Design a protein with these regions (language model features):
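Solvent-exposed, non-transmembrane regions of membrane-associated and secreted proteins
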Residues: 1-84, 90-100, 105-156
Length: 156
């Protein structure tokens, strides 16, 4: 599974923050491209939530994607690969409730071996999957060869 480079101009949802890596972003809504891959935000400065899955804080694997960088510089998830088990992710939900997630794993996968079921599949409790590009940048295809995925479970 690959993420596409550009996503739609979409309405905002609620803000997210990852203080340990300096992320504070609004979340836009993301769907799928015509090819069936996850859209990503058109802007490198915001992250997006995949509306085909649960909302952050609902039971299951909520997927949030953002860019690592662009020709303009670092993107919202530039430092995502630096997250370690125990780090916290905060999502402000509808009604103002703050959901807190604890990172439990970080992996880098080749895009041609992306574990779609592990990332998008069911989870018994509310979890997050934070996704960005990583690995080596291939200028011939204009894309990174890997995806970095951070796994986090809701603790509050």
């Amino acid at each position: 599974m690959n993420v596409s480079w550009f996503g739609p101009a979409a309405t905002s949802t609620h803000p997210a923050s990852i203080p340990v890596i300096g992320v504070r972003t609004r979340l836009i809504k993301l769907g799928l491209t015509a090819q069936g891959t996850l859209q990503v935000p058109a802007s490198t400065s915001v992250a997006g939530w995949y509306t085909g899955g649960p909302r952050p804080g609902q039971v299951g694997s909520a997927v949030i994607a953002g860019h690592i960088d662009s020709y303009l510089g670092p993107g919202v998830f530039f430092r995502l690969r630096l997250l370690r088990p125990g780090d916290r992710v905060y999502i402000r939900q509808a009604g103002g409730k703050l959901a807190v997630f604890r990172v439990y794993a970080e992996h880098s996968y080749r895009k041609d071996h992306f574990p779609t079921q592990r990332v998008y599949g069911p989870a018994p409790d509310p979890e997050l999957r934070l996704i960005t590009c990583g690995g080596t940048f291939d200028p011939a295809i204009g894309s990174y060869l890997n995806n970095v995925v951070v796994y986090a479970a809701q603790i509050r």
